[in-house]
Regions:
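Conserved acetyl-CoA-binding loop-helix of GNAT-fold acetyltransferases
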Residues: 89-91, 97-111, 133-137
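Conserved beta-strand-loop-alpha-helix junction that forms the acyl-donor binding cleft
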Residues: 122-132
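GNAT-family acyltransferases
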Residues: 1-86, 91-94, 110-111, 115, ...
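A SAM-dependent methyltransferase catalytic signature shared across enzymes that methylate proteins
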Residues: 138-142
Length: 163
């Protein structure tokens, strides 16, 4: 199986991705696969969180395979007062269907478990799709609906990982 790595995004990397993405491959030795950042609004949010002092392990990650950035995702922030974290992810269209999202999400679930998080949550569009399959494979269960400012109604998913 192909090794998938999740690499925390640094402030410097986020700034380059946001303002000078054409410089990223030469600076970091990683090719950006077109479409790796399906939700570009996540990048400024991640950059601001890092500048505000959110620890990198609770922010965004590059999903890499060999020397390519194939996706982007991670946590939306540190655990809340109830011990929950939320994850999100996207994979470049040309690299989908290869298990990369499942491998990345599994890595974040394991990281959350190691830090004593009680539950990992995620949201998907309200229809069966590859992302719902990723979450089901990892043991997430659908836990109702929520309203997303950009997407409207979404399905809420939860995986209990601690006590």
């Amino acid at each position: 199986m192909t090794r998938v790595d999740v690499v925390p995004v640094s402030v410097e990397q986020a700034e380059v991705l946001l303002h000078r993405p054409d410089e990223f491959p030469e600076r970091y030795g990683l090719t950006l696969v077109p479409g790796f950042l399906e939700f570009p609004e996540a990048l400024p949010h991640s950059l601001q969180a890092l500048r505000d002092g959110v620890a990198a392990e609770w922010s965004s990650y590059l999903i890499t395979v060999r020397d390519e950035v194939v996706g982007f995702g991670g946590f939306t922030g540190p655990p809340d007062e109830e011990g929950r974290v939320e994850i999100g992810y996207s994979i470049a269209p040309a690299r989908r269907g290869r298990g990369y999202a499942t491998a990345a999400a599994r890595a974040w679930v394991e990281r959350a478990r190691a830090f004593g998080v009680r539950a990992v949550t995620a949201h998907t569009l309200p229809a069966e799709n590859p992302s719902t399959g990723v979450l089901r494979r990892l043991g997430f269960v659908r836990d109702g609906e929520a309203t997303d400012a950009d997407e409207g109604t979404v399905w809420r998913w939860v995986l209990r990982v601690g006590s």
